[in-house]
Amino acid sequence: MKLKILMDNHTEIDVYYLGEPAVSYWIETEEKAFLFDAGYSDAFLKNAEGMGIDVTQAEAVLLSHSHNDHTGGLKPLLALDFLKKPQFIAHPDALLPHDWNGMEIGSPVSKEELSEKFDLHLTKEPVWLTEKLVWLGEIPHTLDFEPAYAIGTVEKDGEKREDYISDDTALAYVGEKGLSIITGCSHAGICNIIAYAKKLTGVEKIQSVLGGFHLFHVDERAKATISFLKEENIPELYPCHCTSFAVRAALHGECPVKEVAVGTELEWK
């Protein structure tokens, strides 16, 4: 499986793509191609064009969660002409209104708009995209140091309630050397995600983890996360997006952290 980073907070020197505080990945397997998250704007589409990637070839568009740094680019994506009607796979809560301090932070496009271009598959359950690649669905909180926490509110069944971001999910690829896990923001907790991916696939060895860890301070939660990741003995860690420099530096003191940016290509067999 090959993965190309279409959007991240960071760009590389002498590699002239656009960056923004957002995430988008292009994934190719032997059988199919997938778009995982759509950044904050149309910048991921401009980067894809510069990389020679035609996103209209996607078998499915996958969402990690609702927040607009992952869904903001859906509006320009809808303006494209797809050769066939791709699937759109997301948690049912991902397309609900999400608010933070009076500001809408959810998807800028509705379920009805998306259904015009995509075959919507809204589910809490895991979806096997290929024999080796799975969209994990709703992540259970099983680790005491990674409890659910609220960010703003979500409007559901006609009422606003605290948003515990239950729509947050990730991908797992079953490779020859173990699992490779790809996250958006890891609001569910990167360690909860790893634990669930292992349980779901039956694979104990983690080969790599890529994505946002949603850790900004080297606090008790971050320290417990670092201890967990060290215990897992993961050869390749690619924390990016919503992982601060301080946390990445602390993690690098204990684990093999590798740098990624817009345009980085990774491959797992």
What is each stretch, according to the model?
Residues K2-M51, Y164-T183:
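Conserved beta-strand hairpin/beta-sheet module of binuclear metal-dependent hydrolase folds
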Residues K4, I89, D119-K124, V134-L136, ...:
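General small-molecule cofactor/ligand-binding pocket signal
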Residues D8-H10, A38-S41, S66, P92-A94, ...:
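Active-site metal-binding loops of divalent metal-dependent hydrolases
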Residues Y17, K32-A60, K75-P76, P147, ...:
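Pre-active-site segment of Zn-dependent metallo-hydrolases
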Residues A43-H91, T201-S208:
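Active-site metal-binding motif and surrounding structural segment of the metallo-beta-lactamase
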Residues H67-T71, P76, Y164-A170, V174-A261:
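Cap/insert and terminal regions of metallo-dependent hydrolase folds
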Residues D93-E116:
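Active-site neighborhood of divalent metal-dependent phosphoester bond hydrolases
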Residues G102-E104, E125-E176:
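Active-site-proximal loop/helix segment associated with metal-binding centers of metalloenzymes
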